[in-house]
Structure formats: C-alpha cells, structure tokens
Amino acid sequence: MEWLDVSTENCPVQSTLDLVGEKWTLLILRDAFIRVRRFDDFRRHIGLSDAVLSDRLRKLVAAGILTTVPYQEAGSRTRNEYRLTGKGRDLWPILMALRQWGETHAADPGGQVLDVRHTECGAPVRVVVECDGPHGALAPTEVTAAPGPAARRVRSPLPE
C-alpha cells in the first residue's frame, strides 16, 4: 500500500493537532512549560479572554495533558493551578521545535525572545531527529516512511 492509499482518519499528526493544534492552546502549553500555573497568570501573560482560556484549560485537563492542583491564598477561595502531566510533558519536544523554527524563520529582529539553555552546562538546547542506532541528527532525505500496521486503506469514493 502506498501513502496516498492510506486513510488519514487515524493519523497521529491529525490526532495531535485535534488536541493541541490551536494557537491559544499552544501558547498555554508554552507558558505551562515555563511554570506558569495560575489562571490569572495565563490570562495576563497570553492576553486572551476568560471564556477562551477556561475552554482551552478545560480541554487540556480533559485530554490528560494538564491536571489541576487546588491552592488557596489567605483570605481567598480555593482555586486550581494547572500543571503538566506526563502526557503533557511529552509535548516538550514539539514546543521546543516550534520555538526553534520560529527563532530561525520568524524571528524578532532584536534577537531571541526566549533563551533556552541546559541548566547544568549553560549551552543552548536544540531539537533534532535522531536514529535509534549509532547515527546522529538526520535530515528528511535520510529517512524513509512507509505505512505501519495501523494503516487503513482509503475508502473508495462513492460513485457519482
């Protein structure tokens, strides 16, 4: 079966975009990775309405990407912080790849907006695609892709 014969109904890229592919969702995740946790802080930093933020946070919690942790400041009602789950933390390479691409192709003329470095040695970090074998970073021309075991054939279009 060739790629164009494969249905995209169960495509993992499509499924991921369905969960996190919207602009505000990605910006919430960006901030969550930088340890923004509270509703008011997300709203103030990202600049979106309460309704949109509530909706996106609810969807991220329902998808198991964020979890809520109650907190209470003195004299205030109990509220929730939003923290990344293991599933949410697995999105780190995606957010870093978007940041890296943006710094290369859509950069602010003044330089980096977010300088991300390895805590231990201070070197800048970057995202690469590597082989599980003894090879380093790979270019798209150095890999092959073929339909996997979950690939389904595209259904024939209905006759006209």
Description of each model-found segment:
Residues 1-8:
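Long, low-complexity, charged/polar intrinsically disordered regions in eukaryotic proteins
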Residues 11-52:
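N-terminal helix-turn-helix DNA-binding core of bacterial DNA-binding proteins
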Residues 21, 73-95:
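Basic, amphipathic "hinge/linker" alpha-helix immediately C-terminal to the N-terminal HTH DNA-binding motif
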Residues 64-65:
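Glycine-centered, phosphate/nucleic-acid-interacting loop/turn motifs that mediate DNA/RNA or nucleotide
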Residues 68:
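Short beta-strand "wing" residues that participate in macromolecule-binding interfaces
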Residues 71-74, 121:
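Short polar/acidic secondary-structure junctions
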Residues 96, 100-160:
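C-terminal regulatory/oligomerization modules of transcriptional regulators
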